[in-house]
């Protein structure tokens, strides 16, 4: 959530920066309500000052019968004040409602652009392999090896669900353990295992609600939401808390399944594992001092890259432009892995800095000094990595002409020494 004071003092700049997202986001409603709020505050404070002054006069009158007119007058004033306070509460709630639907301001370092075509390539790692045959897409490889069963997934549930079998299921489990071991042992993250369902406050804190409710799976009695990413429960671990400056940055790594309705994705990636309603992911979440969040984003991105490097999967790092960053993000790097079976790079991780946007919504703060006023932390998160898409990348990059798939060296200890799926 944006700072109301900042918007009030910089409303034209705020609208200009929001416009770079490519959305129609005018703050006329905010401006009108904010002016009404300030007028109500001014009038209410004037009446409260009058009430205090007259109350002092009444206290000095010994014969209270001579103060009846003033007492009656102050009762009327008190009623007016109560009415104004009630109206002010309604205006504050309306302003809060507006702010909850306004996206974050792009960071000055975010490239300005109109679509994903304006994203900027930062670097590449590895060289796509050359094959003496036409590489197959992962869904063909998985079905031929009997490790991915899309038909059974559809029978059990519906479209965009998959059953993994044998070495396919084992590789998912191996990748989760490999990623968590790397991030906890080498990168300094604390592993947590959060609930896979959260309440409305948690979804609001990270920015999924109120704007993106149609993208979520939810229960109605009680009202819980299946998480679209571990970012939601892990960021909300510290909701409503004041953290110690000495504890920053706080780093968490979490494996969870993720659940997304994929509203608006009809017809996209209908085959394979790229776009599923349920998928596994290892998430990295950080709480940072504001002065260090830019540096922490670079470290977070490097931590996610390390997974791809150890698995020897070619990838590139893209800086997302202002029109392509997520609702809550101020700055984002996407890691895109090379998929020879599809002859393109596809996103496998998104690493973002949110500034104080989520912290303001979730009220996560720290103190610069022991007795100083609390300030909002900066939050960051990124996939480290999307497990299903990593499996996709392994199947396509390590496929052999005979239809088998070689297991990456780094993953073999987690696969019981298995060197090849055939």
From Swiss-Prot:
Keywords: Aminoacyl-tRNA synthetase, ATP-binding, Cytoplasm, Ligase, Nucleotide-binding, Protein biosynthesis. Catalyzes the attachment of serine to tRNA(Ser). Is also able to aminoacylate tRNA(Sec) with serine, to form the misacylated tRNA L-seryl-tRNA(Sec), which will be further converted into selenocysteinyl-tRNA(Sec). PANTHER family: SERINE--TRNA LIGASE (PTHR43697:SF1), SERYL-TRNA SYNTHETASE (PTHR43697). This is Serine--tRNA ligase. The lineage of its organism: Bacteria, Pseudomonadati, Thermodesulfobacteriota, Desulfuromonadia, Desulfuromonadales. It comes from Pelobacter propionicus (strain DSM 2379 / NBRC 103807 / OttBd1). GO terms for molecular function: ATP binding; serine-tRNA ligase activity. PROSITE patterns: AA_TRNA_LIGASE_II. It is found in: Cytoplasm.
